[in-house]
Amino acid sequence: MNEITLFIKSSSANAERRINPQWTVSQLKTKLVPIVGTPEQYQKLTYEPASSTVPGHVFTSEEENLDLGEFKLQPLGTIVVEDTRPPHLRLDFDDLSQVDKYVMPREQYENRTDSVYAWKKRNQLGRFNPDFEASKASRQESLKRELVDLQKNLNSRCCAAGERYGTIRYIGLVPEINNDNLWVGVEFDEPVGKNDGTVSGKRYFNAKNKHGSFLRSSEVEVGDFPPEDILEGL
């Protein structure tokens, strides 16, 4: 019987494999161990066909010795592997904090001649550029001038992309986003924003949930955009 191509999906892996329909469900689980990292006895398999017109299937423990060919698996379908172990017993391959790592002392790293640090230093890039501090100071002065110019729009009505109307409640730096741009905090009339005026736990203005957003000044148009009167026309 010809092999078929199926996708293997789990919380830690996405792969494409050729499956022999003559394998039993138990044999498939054994072959999945090095792919998904879950022992056979803790694997819960679900077949999701590529076509919505074909029914899927959840494999049970009573089907361990049945051939895969009996389930009429279609090419390009997906086998979803769920790890049934308690969370604390699962291996988290994305948690690098659990991996022992060698950390080179800073002084030793800076004395190396084959590092990115040394390369930047030789080529006077970044903070090693003689003009770096001057350029940084110039940028800060530019931001200050831009801030003074924009402050006149504080508490003004505005419109953002998608015909989202609101009021400007904050203009300035938001270090939690970056220190390179000024940000305009908008309180929208409707829940079309991303937050409530806070970023990473720091509050910049007050707004209802999903009524606040931080946008670049180029994304905000200031003008005569009065709040919509929901009673108008009644």
Curated annotation (Swiss-Prot):
Record GO biological process: cytoplasmic microtubule organization; tubulin complex assembly
Single GO cellular component term: cytosol
PROSITE patterns reported for this sequence: CAP_GLY_1, CAP_GLY_2, UBIQUITIN_2
Domain CAP-Gly: 174-216
Keywords: Chaperone, Cytoplasm, Cytoskeleton, Microtubule, Phosphoprotein
Record's subcellular location: Cytoplasm, Cytoskeleton
Modification type Phosphoserine: residues: S213
Recorded GO MF terms: microtubule plus-end binding
Pfam annotation, one family: Ubiquitin_2
Residue ranges of domain Ubiquitin-like in the record: 4-88
InterPro entries reported for this sequence: CAP-Gly_dom_sf, CAP-Gly_domain, Ubiquitin-like_dom, Ubiquitin-like_domsf
Family, similarity comment: Belongs to the TBCB family.
Role: Required for microtubule function and cell polarity. Involved in the proper folding of alpha-tubulin.
Subunit structure: Binds to monomeric alpha-tubulin. Interacts with alp21.
Protein's recorded name: Cell polarity protein alp11
Organism: Schizosaccharomyces pombe (strain 972 / ATCC 24843)
